[in-house]
């Protein structure tokens, strides 16, 4: 039962392994990134014009799930972006589990991009879904190189990572992220019948709502989105069965208003579920938001 405590942080099921695209249109070059401990794929249409990089982050399925999203990659490249699909666990050379992932790993990705020909340095857009959205916002709050964030079904706080097994769960919960060798403060998932029911039924939103009632823990683990150095788009789903992405997005919007955030920010909510991020109205909104920011 305790194993279930934090398993509810999972994103919707997606392909566990990336298949390197072989059906890209002519003119788009794909290459693997395996240097300085990184594991990712990079997509670019060669051009003499400097291009802005978009880093795409998956959720708790691990690996490079965006490398499978050929249609989305092509759309972003056609808008003038170069695209990095970046794994941060669950891939060769990386941790097996979503636990204590060093944020410094992503600084290596920023550095790698800064060394690439015709890539605009230190001006990156991040797009993440579920735990990847939590990560994108967290990185934006700590690294000024992040100048745009698209957060799909995001969390407003840091949550723990799933345990490795029952014995591991009995030892306690651990943050999904670390910085400077220390765990990033997180909101624990309480052990209760609400948690148990959520894990049995698959409807886990109430479980997270209970965790979010702990005001002191929430404030300590809140992502400082007001520190992000550029525009933010929150995309949420009113029938989200994983966690309350609509409520958490609204909380972050209020936080930005209260702190006089000087960049553009908006929240688009859709009457659908956590796993339906690619449906047409949602994806059209994301493209429209990023359009015109590619250079």
Regions found by a protein language model. Name each.
Residues 141, 148-227, 242, 258:
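Accessory cap/linker subdomain of secreted extracellular hydrolases
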Residues 12-52:
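N-terminal cap/lid segment of alpha/beta-hydrolase-fold proteins
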Residues 118-130:
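Alpha/beta-hydrolase fold nucleophile elbow
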Residues 128-138:
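Glycine-rich nucleophile elbow surrounding the catalytic serine of serine-hydrolase chemistry
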Residues 96, 235, 247-295:
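C-terminal catalytic histidine-bearing segment of alpha/beta-hydrolase fold enzymes
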Residues 49-51, 57-95, 241-245:
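Short substrate-entry loop that stabilizes the transition state in hydrolases
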Residues 228, 234-236, 240:
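Short beta-strand/loop motif that positions the catalytic acidic residue
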Residues 97-117:
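Alpha/beta-hydrolase active-site loop
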């Amino acid at each position: 039962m305790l194993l279930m405590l934090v398993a509810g942080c999972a994103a919707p099921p997606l392909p566990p392994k990336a298949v390197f695209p072989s059906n890209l249109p002519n003119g788009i070059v794909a290459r693997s990134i395996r240097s300085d401990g990184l594991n990712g794929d990079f997509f670019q249409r060669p051009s003499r014009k400097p291009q802005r990089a978009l880093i795409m982050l998956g959720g708790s399925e691990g690996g490079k799930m965006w490398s499978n999203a050929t249609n989305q990659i092509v759309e972003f490249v056609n808008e003038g972006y170069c695209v990095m699909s970046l794994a941060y666990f669950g891939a060769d050379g990386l941790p097996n589990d979503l636990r204590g992932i060093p944020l410094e790993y992503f600084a290596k990705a920023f550095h790698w991009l800064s060394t690439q020909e015709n890539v605009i340095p230190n001006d990156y857009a991040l797009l993440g879904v579920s735990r990847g959205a939590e990560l994108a916002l967290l990185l934006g709050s700590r690294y000024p190189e992040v100048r745009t964030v698209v957060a799909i079904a995001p969390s407003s706080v840091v949550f723990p990572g799933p345990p490795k097994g029952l014995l591991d769960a009995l030892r306690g919960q651990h943050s999904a992220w670390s910085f400077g060798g220390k765990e990033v403060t997180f909101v624990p998932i309480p052990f209760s019948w609400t948690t148990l029911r959520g894990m049995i039924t698959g409807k886990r939103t109430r479980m997270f709502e209970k965790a979010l009632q702990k005001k002191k823990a929430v404030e300590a683990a809140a992502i400082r989105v007001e520190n992000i150095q550029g525009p933010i788009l929150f995309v949420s789903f009113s029938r989200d069965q994983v966690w309350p992405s609509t409520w958490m997005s609204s909380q972050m919007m209020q936080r930005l208003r209260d702190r006089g955030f000087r960049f553009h920010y908006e929240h688009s909510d859709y009457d659908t579920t956590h796993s339906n991020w690619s449906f047409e109205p949602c994806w059209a909104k994301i493209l429209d938001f990023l359009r015109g920011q590619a250079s």
